[in-house]
Amino acid sequence: MANVTLSSVYKAFGEAVISRDINLEIDDGEFVVFVGPSGCGKSTLLRMIAGLEDITSGELLIGGKRMNEVPPSERGIGMVFQSYALYPHLSVAENMSFGLKLAGVKKAEIYQRVNQVAEVLQLAHLLDRRPKALSGGQRQRVAIGRTLVSEPDVFLLDEPLSNLDAALRVQMRIEISRLHKRLERTMIYVTHDQVEAMTLADKIVVLDAGNIAQVGKPLELYHYPANRFVAGFIGSPKMNFLPVKVTAAEPRQVQIELPNHQRVWLPVEGDQVQVGANMSLGIRPEHLLPSSASEVTLEGEIQVVEQLGNETQIHIQIPAIRQNLVYRQNDVVLVEEGATFSIGLPPHRCHLFREDGTACKRLYQELGV
């Protein structure tokens, strides 16, 4: 096992900058997820750790040793790709042992490692089968098993579940989580799927256009996003944003004026907030309330109703702003498109963002954080 340290890592292809000043510490045995939209540089960052891409500048340490010039085979890493990359003419056992044979490992040790890993991944009864006789989930487990038998210090997983259907993704998420708890090895996982990030990670690294937007535990990012990008990326449906103006500011609260001219005090730090400033109020769809449950309300016209069975998502057009607000409520809500609908804003659940996108620190203590 090993910790991973990236210090001022910078990557460019010609004039195209992919990673900018990446500073990150990944602890020994930690499960870290790189998440972000397409093109944010998350896979390139993983490939630099693996040694498949050169680092333009900066330093990479694995287990305290500089790895910039060390070839991939000597870094003590194992990598699982989006594509399973299994040899179709070889059995499961032969696929899992292929790398060990090339490395000159003795047959008895190969047999022991393959069978041990097969038991862990519930593949023991499939060792004689070829890939064409396996399901997608089984093939992915074989690809993971091929990495496990090499006994790496650090596991790198590049969108390993993206080729699976929804049911298999859920199953494999659970299996990967159990595997990490059992092995206690350092794992670095790349995905664009925030559900995978939230459910698997000890720590999430949110990337935006080659920069680290925020690093933190899943619930920290959900409840206390450092900026508007993270607030809008983490959570589904994404956070609602409203244009507001600051009408008063104190050290531990800020008063803002909503688009309907209501004024409300928010429990956020106000030391660096200027009266008269234009800001954005953010609130998650699941934190909105029925209008009867809050003194602060907004009224609008229902544009779309999405009935999901376990919950209802209502898209509401608020006068004086151009975007819809999304209100999410557990269970079925019977309303009609075109009807007038009122929602309540609980001040303690609101976020406040400056014009540059940075967040004012929330002072309300959320559970589990």
Swiss-Prot record:
Domain of life: Bacteria
InterPro entries recorded: AAA+_ATPase, ABC_transporter-like_ATP-bd, ABC_transporter-like_CS, ABC_transpr_MalK-like, ABC_transpr_MalK/UgpC-like, Mo/tungstate-bd_C_term_dom, NA-bd_OB-fold, OB_MalK-like
Entry GO MF terms: ABC-type maltose transporter activity; ATP binding; ATP hydrolysis activity
Record's subcellular location: Cell inner membrane
UniProt EC number: 7.5.2.1
Annotated GO CC locations: ATP-binding cassette (ABC) transporter complex, substrate-binding subunit-containing; maltose transport complex
Keyword Cell inner membrane in record: yes
Residue ranges annotated for the ABC transporter domain, each copy included: 4-234
Membrane topology: Peripheral membrane protein
Residues at which ATP binds: G36, P37, S38, G39, C40, G41, K42, S43
Keywords for this protein: ATP-binding, Cell inner membrane, Cell membrane, Membrane, Nucleotide-binding, Sugar transport, Translocase, Transport
Catalytic activity: D-maltose(out) + ATP + H2O = D-maltose(in) + ADP + phosphate + H(+)
Function: Part of the ABC transporter complex MalEFGK involved in maltose/maltodextrin import. Responsible for energy coupling to the transport system.
Assembly information from the UniProt record: The complex is composed of two ATP-binding proteins (MalK), two transmembrane proteins (MalG and MalK) and a solute-binding protein (MalE).
NCBIfam families assigned: PRK11000.1, PRK11650.1
Family: Belongs to the ABC transporter superfamily. Maltooligosaccharide importer (TC 3.A.1.1.1) family.
Protein name in the entry: Maltose/maltodextrin import ATP-binding protein MalK
